[in-house]
Amino acid sequence: MNKLQFIAIIAALLFISCENNDDLVLDNQLELNYSYSPIPLGDINAKFSEDISYGPEARNTFDIFLPDSDQPTPLVIYIHGGGFISGNKEIVYEPMWNGSWDFPEEIKTLLNAKIAFATINYRLLEFKDDPDGVLKSLNDSKRALQFIKNNSKALNIYKNNIILTGSSAGAGTSLWLGFSDDMADLSNKDKVLRESTRVKAVAVKATQATYDLEKFQSLIFAEYNFKWMDYFELDPAMYHRFKSFYGMSSLNEFYTEDITNYRRKVDMLSMMTEDDPEFWVANLQKPVVAPTQNTIVTHHAYHAKTLKTWADSIGIANVAYYGDYEHPTGESFVDFILRKAME
């Protein structure tokens, strides 16, 4: 067989394969367009790329800082807060207004240590009558993680050394991803969704312990005799957000089989197993008082306390700060990330 015949046969076989196999997905190299950094980097050697699309929706985008390196680098992914109804990835380009988080300085510290940094957007919930509920937002963040892993070579990152971070809703999302079993769908036609969702570590601030909101009553705030129906009288707007959180049209659906199953899918507390990654958590911004305001309900010290209690009982390493409790090591957010990235 001469060379031309061999090439013709191979080409024909590939053509037939493409016609008969819808699963065939060709690898397209991610093309990055670099722009000016939104924060002054000084003499740090790093590039910045913004609004990279990771999915079909308008808010399926992320920005990334990439340190110059001749080897793949660790990566920190930041997921913004906002109660799943507001917020955006650009929040990290200025220090937090209350002084609790100096994002730009921390980003520069990471870049100096040859650690890349990404910040993502995701779809938000409608304030009233969202048909999909919070899984819409959570699954967007999942896809962002998988997309980045799928393009790890183009981004020069080490896909098995990714640390998730976030505040408020982004904190809870990070924990949901960290404590979920691997959500790789190996038979999916979409190559992105075949990627593992396992991460090296999670570091969060002002988090929620679970998105099964029933456990706010029965577990987290049990000592306060907290009841959602009583809370709705204090904060009527929360009534609509509560329904949208699970895609409910009525609160009467809350204990139905469908919504009970939905709540189970977002209960990261119950997802904890001993093989889950080490985490760092700090809920220090709100007073340790009865949860009678929205920001206290969602950012209370007892969320971090509950996470630590469950993790300790299972055997998951953790560094926690809440109320008057401080981890014996005093390890900071950045120091935790540096330690885990270098392990």
Where do the model's predicted regions map?
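C-terminal motif of bacterial Sec signal peptides marking the signal peptidase cleavage site
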Residues: 14-17
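Short beta-strand-to-loop junctions in surface cap/lid or active-site-entrance loops
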Residues: 62-71, 155, 268-273
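Short beta-strand element of the alpha/beta-hydrolase
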Residues: 72-87
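Alpha/beta-hydrolase active-site loop
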Residues: 131-153
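Serine-hydrolase catalytic core
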Residues: 211-218, 226-324
